[in-house]
Amino acid sequence: MQCCRMEGEIMNQRVGRSSIRLAQPVCVIAGASIVGKKEGEGPLGALFDMVGEDDLFGCKTWEEAESNLQKDAVYMVMEKAGWKAEDVSYLFAGDLLGQCIATSFGISAYNIPLFGVYGACSTCGEALTLGAVMAAGGYAEHVVCVTSSHFASAEKEFRFPLDYGNQRPLSASWTVTGSGAFALGLNQKCRAHITGMTPGRIVDYGLKDSMNMGACMAPAAADTIERHLEDFHVQPQEYDRIITGDLGSVGQTVLIDLLREKGIDIAGRHMDCGIEIFDADAQDTHAGGSGCGCSAVTLAAYILPKLESGKWKKVLFLPTGALLSKTSFNEGKSVPGIAHAVVLESPVVK
């Protein structure tokens, strides 16, 4: 199916059942990453724009600290893009807390029209998808996308108070303290191009273990990857990397096995942001990192530079989310997953 507008206007193209190919790529003009001390001590520590000395970031509460992460990340990415707040048409932002309070308190001072989005740890992919479509459609000149998470605020929201000192199983992940922000627009200097996307569907295999979110999210990632390859008529080898957000070591194994059952082999090209951001053994993070800050800061600090330099030509970036809450968990509900895929390509032509 092809959707056209009048001559002279931008044409976008829908491909397959549920994917979009942008007729005019959207530029990722800049990315910014701010993380906590633990993330700064990990393998990617030297790549982040800013590393906090402690996880309160000079604030009185964990939630206020996360709000400051978003505020500072948005300021930093606008500064990199050469924009002021009044130059930004729309802001797409989200976090893990109830009613997205980290977002609403964090970016309120900018006075930018806000689309608050929530897809759990897939929120970065959702924000980039919606922001890119808005820019590609000619509805916005400048767009900022930002997501955040915080280990302590997430533990308080979804699990146990830190003072409780509960033991975590090896399948558990460690919520990343960090915020990643991105400036999007058309016909501008690019660090990478957004050329297409495959929005995720809710996939529920009936798993109820909130301490094994990688396994809960892996079926959704497999579903999105399979649909993406079918819609775009491409093979995994056409991507330098297929990058999930925070499946961790357990979820990675499940994802690879699920796709192999469908005749799709991504083992040699799969990368997971949650595995990359921590040294699981040295930092005792078990299955790896998680949170909607995990994929965002890894994209800004690690993935974009590889695309900008031309070392990677094309990647499929799909943050993964576990759609649970305290209420759903306590009522015995399962943990559905979702994964939004975004195609990122290098601006370097060789």
Question: Predicted regions: what is each one?
Answer:
Residues 3-4:
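Cysteine-centered motifs
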Residues 8-63, 161-226, 231-234, 265-284, ...:
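Condensing-enzyme catalytic core mediating Claisen C-C bond formation in acyl metabolism
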Residues 66-82, 130, 216-231, 298-303:
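Short, well-ordered amphipathic alpha-helical segments that serve as non-catalytic structural scaffolds
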Residues 118-145, 182-184, 290-311:
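Active-site-proximal alpha-helical scaffold in enzymes
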